Regions:
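Single conserved hydrophobic/aromatic residue that forms the stacking wall/gate
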Residues: 1-9, 13
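Catalytic-domain carbohydrate-binding cleft regions of carbohydrate-active enzymes
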Residues: 15-37, 46-52, 56-58, 63-241
């Protein structure tokens, strides 16, 4: 990754809605043309590895009508607001892979303390690629660790609905790991509550409760609640508007 203006950079991490671009939102794309000098974006490619990597390809792109459709929707709106409020250029590092679990963004040393996680190659390969533990951390996150950022954005949880009892602690462990890698103290960690989707297991409310509990475990964090933002007819849409 080449250098970009250091005034504001955010890491936008995880999940299929983070990974969802603004393509098709024509009004937003037209508006994005005015952000050329204020917003930069780099997408980390979907990559997996059994061991931590030191390099990853990536190229900063300015926000234009031509490039905006590829920008992560969550990251774009956050960056646009930051640029408007702070009056400085903003860079978004889009390090996302849809549908992954919190364990996918955690290192081996921490995962070895979780009795339900199989870290053998056979065990990992027996798991669906986007649900595998550790491999996204190794290939996508570790190479950019230490790159100057001002905070992390996290929109994830659906794939951990059935493991809600462990979620708060595991999310806290992950954030602690990241902060230790970046060596910038308790840099902000903002995360989004999973939508009130009608999960077949009925565990959605328990996962949201675990996300709320994580606030007490993660210093300098903020949870964006979505429970009151969803229309009744969207209960069967895992990613409502």
């Amino acid at each position: 990754l080449h250098r970009v203006d250091r005034r504001q950079r955010q890491m936008c991490i995880r999940d299929r809605f983070n990974n969802c671009p603004i393509a098709g939102a024509n009004e937003i794309i037209a508006r994005a043309g005015s952000m050329r000098d204020r917003l930069r974006y780099v997408k980390i490619p979907l990559t997996a590895a059994y061991t931590p990597q030191d390099r990853v390809p990536g190229k900063w792109r300015p926000c234009t009508v031509e490039t905006a459709p590829d920008f992560t929707a969550t990251g774009y709106f956050f960056a646009e607001l930051l640029a408007d409020v702070l009056h400085v250029p903003v860079g978004i590092v889009d390090c996302t892979w849809g549908g992954t679990r919190v364990e996918g963004w955690t290192n081996r040393e921490i995962l070895e303390t979780y009795p339900d996680i199989d870290l053998t190659e056979k065990g990992i390969e027996a798991t669906t690629d986007w649900l595998r533990p550790m491999v996204m951390y190794n290939a996508m996150l570790h190479p950019v660790a230490g790159y100057t950022v001002r905070g992390f954005l996290w929109y994830q949880g659906e794939s951990n609905v059935n493991q809600y009892k462990d979620y708060a602690v595991r999310l806290s462990n992950m954030v602690g790991l990241w902060r230790s890698l970046w060596k910038q103290g308790d840099i902000p960690f903002y995360y989004v509550e999973v939508a009130p989707f009608a999960y077949g297991s009925g565990n959605g409310p328990y996962l949201r409760e675990a996300q709320w509990e994580a606030r007490e475990l993660i210093p300098n964090s903020g949870l964006i609640c979505t429970n009151d933002l969803v229309e009744p007819y969207e209960a069967t849409n895992i990613h409502p508007k």
